[in-house]
């Protein structure tokens, strides 16, 4: 999802269904391949021409053995790209083993390779605009941590404290608003501090017990 956003601007909350971006070395623009009902998000949020936003039919959703990548394979064949080298983000979140099998079986004449985090390596070098977003995220993160120190007190329910933290992180500042983060606030307390990634509960904070606070400020999807 993050690399789709980086390459096209697409950022709808649809990553739990099969979707992808195709980058051809000789094409002027990438192709954004999304579910039919999510195409509107691509039209709104990306810079792509309409013809480079390809939507697949709802019949491919939860109708095993049909799969959205059946439509993707057909797209690649229609473009006469099925005998080329095809680089995949093999360790990408939400790229399942079934996605891989559909591509491998559907494109027997292609040379299927691991692109070895190619887009991620490009993303390492940040533009001035990206650094601006990251600095904004840092300010929001500071506000969130300050609110955590204020809200976490003995006798306060963990969920009540987190609701104040969340509000602060999303509200941001008068200059720039916050965005949702890739993780929820982690707030293990007491014996929970022995486990790094526990979230909140309805239990109350207890005087004398330690609490770990992990959160992230976000601006335009850039985290700090």
Write out the residue ranges for each language-model feature.
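Generic secondary-structure signature for well-ordered alpha-helical cores
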Residues: 77, 108, 136-146, 150-157, ...
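A generic "cationic amphipathic patch" detector
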Residues: 34, 45, 99, 147, ...
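A composition/biophysics-driven feature that prefers long, compositionally simple stretches
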Residues: 1-143
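Short catalytic-site patches enriched in acidic/histidine residues
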Residues: 4-14, 116-121, 125, 157-224
């Amino acid at each position: 999802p993050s690399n789709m956003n980086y390459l096209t601007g697409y950022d709808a909350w649809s990553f739990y269904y099969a979707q992808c971006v195709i980058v051809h070395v000789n094409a002027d623009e990438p192709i954004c391949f999304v579910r039919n009902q999510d195409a509107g998000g691509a039209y709104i949020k990306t810079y792509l021409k309409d013809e480079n936003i390809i939507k697949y039919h709802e019949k491919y959703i939860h109708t095993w053995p049909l799969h959205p990548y059946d439509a993707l394979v057909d797209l690649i064949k229609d473009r006469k790209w099925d005998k080329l080298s095809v680089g995949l983000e093999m360790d990408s979140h939400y790229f399942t083993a079934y996605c891989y099998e559909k591509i491998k079986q559907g494109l027997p004449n292609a040379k299927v390779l691991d692109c070895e985090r190619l887009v991620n390596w490009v993303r390492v070098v940040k533009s001035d605009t990206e650094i601006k977003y990251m600095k904004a995220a840092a300010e929001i993160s500071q506000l969130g941590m300050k609110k955590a120190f204020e809200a976490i007190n003995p006798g306060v329910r963990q969920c009540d404290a987190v609701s104040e933290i969340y509000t602060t992180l999303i509200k941001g500042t008068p200059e720039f608003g916050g965005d949702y983060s890739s993780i929820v606030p982690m707030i293990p307390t007491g014996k929970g501090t022995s486990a790094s990634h526990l979230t909140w509960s309805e239990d109350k904070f207890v005087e004398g017990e330690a609490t770990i606070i992990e959160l992230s400020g976000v601006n335009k999807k850039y985290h700090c």
